[in-house]
């Protein structure tokens, strides 16, 4: 709402709207901006100027928090607006949401990538001992867990590490040593953030990237958990380790979009509009 350059008259742009389902990215744009009162006032004034008393926000936890702030600010200034939050996050980490649009396609990408990288890894197993595939996900391991979807028999992944289960580095190294001795190579999938059994983060000193305006670490711009583990495995076990970090490819590769995810996104949009028409007052 802060940038009106993306406004579309749906009555005149049906072909454009239909093409969006197969287009990477978000036409409406995205933001990591920390919302302040000035932003809330700007949004409210733009809504009033447009004669609008309704707002649909699409996104994850940050978006939902901003929408809650918007409702409170409008009410405090004497305006009754209707606000709906439509879930959309590849991390699938919204409380109360079973599956958010975006997650299915990210899961499909990761499962396909792990399957195909594993085949390449096996071809190079004469000089690569360990492959570490780092996924997006922030504080949740849904994307990493999806790496098993195309697993067959003893194929990758051999080990999956998610933030929901704290990692004991000593035990992990012993498991890697054991699996390598047994099969000659180990394929590990790790979430971009992992909790350590000692109460900290795995490779915390390697998470040296910047933070966004909300104070959250931008893991994809740091040296990363995967690289930390690769270095650790090499230095302590003497096993040559490679770290793969596809990062934003997981949410941008249009050829990996899952059809159920596409359908879910459309249904979520329709449900948001339907819910908006059924709301009666501020805060609903």
Residue ranges and their predicted role:
Residues 47-48, 80-83:
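Signature of multi-pass transmembrane helix bundles
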Residues 95-107, 256-259:
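Short beta-strand elements at the ligand-binding edges of bilobed clamshell
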């Amino acid at each position: 709402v802060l940038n009106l350059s993306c406004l579309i008259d749906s009555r005149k742009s049906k072909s454009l709207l239909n093409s969006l389902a197969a287009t990477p990215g978000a036409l409406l744009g995205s933001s990591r901006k920390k919302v302040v009162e000035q932003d809330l006032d700007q949004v409210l004034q733009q809504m009033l100027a447009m004669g609008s008393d309704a707002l649909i926000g699409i996104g994850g936890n940050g978006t939902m928090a901003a929408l809650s702030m918007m409702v409170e600010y409008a009410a405090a200034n004497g305006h009754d607006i209707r606000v709906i939050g439509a879930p959309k996050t590849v991390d699938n980490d919204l409380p109360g949401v079973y599956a958010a649009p975006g997650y299915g396609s990210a899961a499909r990408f990761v499962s396909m990538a792990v399957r195909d990288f594993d085949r390449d890894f096996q071809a190079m197993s004469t000089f690569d001992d360990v492959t570490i595939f780092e996924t997006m996900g922030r504080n949740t391991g849904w994307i990493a867990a999806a790496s098993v979807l195309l697993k067959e028999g003893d194929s990758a992944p051999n080990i999956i590490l998610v933030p929901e289960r704290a990692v004991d580095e000593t035990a992990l190294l012993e498991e890697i040593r054991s699996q390598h001795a047994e099969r000659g190579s180990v394929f590990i999938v790790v979430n971009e953030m992992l909790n350590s059994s000692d109460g900290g983060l795995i490779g915390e000193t390697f998470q040296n990237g910047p933070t966004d305006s909300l104070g959250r670490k931008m893991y994809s711009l740091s040296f990363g958990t995967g690289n930390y583990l690769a270095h650790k495995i090499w230095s302590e076990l003497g096993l040559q380790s490679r770290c793969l970090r596809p990062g934003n490819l997981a949410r941008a590769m249009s050829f990996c979009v899952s059809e159920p995810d596409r359908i879910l996104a459309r249904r979520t949009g329709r449900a948001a509009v339907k819910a908006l028409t059924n709301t009666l007052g501020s805060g609903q």
